[in-house]
């Protein structure tokens, strides 16, 4: 697809992703939704939301204008998290939801992501129909002057409904926990205080003052070291860091150690399994999850299923085979019993619930996963597909794997966006992992590398 990537349409705001493009997306998207609407007598309803980056307002106005010109009833949610949109689309009986965000990326980037009425990503077929319309040399879609135009209404109660939903995902409150929260100056900034106060948590916040320019800037789930310091400074038992659009959560234990998505999935998976609530006793992960997670799951008598990198592939696998917990090392964790996508605040609340129920410190809960040292090297290559079929490269990978004898792993995969081959290994020690990666990288460079 030309415009839609795995996470919607992305680009640098106002140059790559322009207001003109947002308007056209609104018109084309609105038209496709109208064509597919089951009930032709009512106007399709679309929820529109954004994160806190300054370009969000510009793109939101343009996108809504496009939707209105195509006859859509728009409910404007304002600033809310991506999983908040996925949830509200379902309960407001909307035909689609649109989130304007570039998630954990820098402030200059922005994106437009569509959700279907079921709260999952819009189907590839519908995205392709939208792309075809965007590629037409001339816009020939209908342009009603009065009857047939859409209307827009603000829907501030969306945030409240979503907050109440999150609070009801656990059976009791979280009193007795001292928490530090990093809102990444993003979409969770205006939610955290309300939710954690309602749940009786004692909490301190940082990075919850968005100014349009400071989203993800040295804070949030991609920079958890900021929260790590804050946790120790405040003497908190646990820290939670979200990203700009609130679909990720990374935790920090009481000592300031970073607890990534792998460890969060293990802790929550084991807890659910012990209560008979983990479907098929299986956790769905991507190939980037650490070997330490698999060893810990195995030791706890749990299974794992692997997918390619990307939270959408995790969700696809979960839906296909009926699993209810999955996610990525980056902190996208999906609790399919509650929501259709990775939800940072939901994940944080579930993790705090496990701490309260077990009475254990986060460092204790996480200690059951021993993370293997990992090294990743990107090699520029002429043809990344051909590199994977090169006999000498295959041979060195096999040699290294044989030497590891199950106490390490190798993953060599092409980059999704650049002419790079990513060479990753995990082993018991830093020395071993460096030696293994260097051996493979030397062969890759000699065979297909370009300087």
From Swiss-Prot:
SUPFAM superfamilies cross-referenced by the UniProt entry: Phosphoglucomutase, C-terminal domain, Phosphoglucomutase, first 3 domains
Main enzyme class: isomerase
Residues holding Mg(2+): 103, 243, 245, 247
Superkingdom in the source lineage: Bacteria
Biological process, per Gene Ontology: carbohydrate metabolic process; peptidoglycan biosynthetic process; UDP-N-acetylglucosamine biosynthetic process
Cofactor binding annotation: Binds 1 Mg(2+) ion per subunit.
EC number: 5.4.2.10
Reactions accelerated catalytically: alpha-D-glucosamine 1-phosphate = D-glucosamine 6-phosphate
Gene Ontology molecular function: any one: phosphoglucosamine mutase activity
Post-translational modification: Activated by phosphorylation.
Chain segments annotated as transmembrane: none
Keyword Isomerase listed: yes
Cofactor(s) named in the record: Mg(2+)
Location of Phosphoserine modifications: 103
Any Pfam family matching the protein: PGM_PMM_II
Active site: residue positions: 103
Keywords: Isomerase, Magnesium, Metal-binding, Phosphoprotein
Listed PANTHER family: PHOSPHOGLUCOMUTASE (ALPHA-D-GLUCOSE-1,6-BISPHOSPHATE-DEPENDENT), PHOSPHOHEXOSE MUTASE
Function text: Catalyzes the conversion of glucosamine-6-phosphate to glucosamine-1-phosphate.
Protein name: Phosphoglucosamine mutase
Originating species: Lactiplantibacillus plantarum (strain ATCC BAA-793 / NCIMB 8826 / WCFS1)
């Amino acid at each position: 697809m030309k415009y839609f990537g795995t996470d919607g349409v992305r680009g640098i705001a106002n140059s790559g992703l322009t207001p003109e493009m947002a308007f056209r997306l609104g018109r084309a998207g609105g038209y496709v939704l109208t064509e597919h609407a089951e009930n032709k007598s009512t106007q399709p309803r679309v929820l529109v939301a954004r994160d806190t980056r300054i370009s969000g307002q510009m793109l939101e106005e343009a996108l809504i204008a496009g939707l209105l010109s195509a006859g859509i009833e728009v409910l404007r949610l304002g600033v809310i998290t991506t999983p908040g949109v996925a949830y509200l689309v379902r309960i407001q009986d909307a035909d689609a939801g649109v989130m304007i965000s570039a998630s954990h990326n820098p402030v200059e980037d922005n994106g437009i992501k569509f959700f279907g009425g079921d709260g999952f990503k819009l189907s590839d077929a519908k995205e392709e129909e939208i792309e075809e319309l965007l590629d037409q040399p001339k816009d020939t879609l209908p342009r009603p002057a009065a009857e047939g135009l859409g209307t827009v209404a603000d829907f501030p109660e969306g945030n409240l409904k979503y907050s109440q939903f999150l609070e009801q995902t656990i059976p009791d409150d979280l009193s007795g926990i001292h928490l530090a929260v990093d809102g990444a100056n993003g979409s969770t900034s205006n939610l955290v205080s309300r939710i954690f106060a309602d749940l009786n948590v004692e909490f301190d916040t940082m990075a919850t003052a968005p100014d349009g320019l400071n989203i993800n800037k040295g804070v949030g789930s991609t920079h958890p070291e900021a929260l790590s310091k804050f946790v120790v400074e405040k003497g908190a038992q646990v820290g939670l860091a979200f990203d700009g659009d609130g679909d990720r959560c990374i935790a920090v234990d009481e000592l300031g150690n970073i607890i990534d998505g792998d460890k969060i999935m293990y802790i929550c998976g084991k807890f659910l399994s012990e209560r008979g609530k983990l479907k098929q006793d299986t956790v769905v992960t991507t190939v980037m999850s650490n070997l330490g997670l698999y060893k810990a799951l195995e030791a706890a008598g749990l299974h794992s299923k692997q997918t390619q990198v990307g939270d959408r592939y995790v969700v696809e696998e979960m839906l296909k085979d009926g699993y209810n917990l999955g996610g990525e090392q980056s902190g996208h964790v999906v609790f399919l019993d509650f929501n259709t996508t990775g939800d940072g605040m939901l994940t944080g609340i579930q993790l705090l619930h496990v701490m309260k129920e077990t009475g254990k410190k986060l460092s204790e809960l996480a200690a059951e996963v021993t993370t293997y040292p990992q090294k990743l090297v990107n090699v520029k290559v002429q043809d990344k597909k051909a590199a994977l079929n090169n006999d000498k490269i295959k041979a060195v990978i096999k040699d290294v794997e044989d030497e590891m004898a199950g106490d390490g792993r190798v993953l060599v995969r092409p980059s999704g966006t650049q002419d790079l081959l990513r060479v990753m290994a995990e082993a018991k020690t830093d020395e071993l992992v460096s030696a293994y990666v260097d051996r493979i990288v030397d062969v890759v460079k000699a065979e297909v590398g370009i300087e």
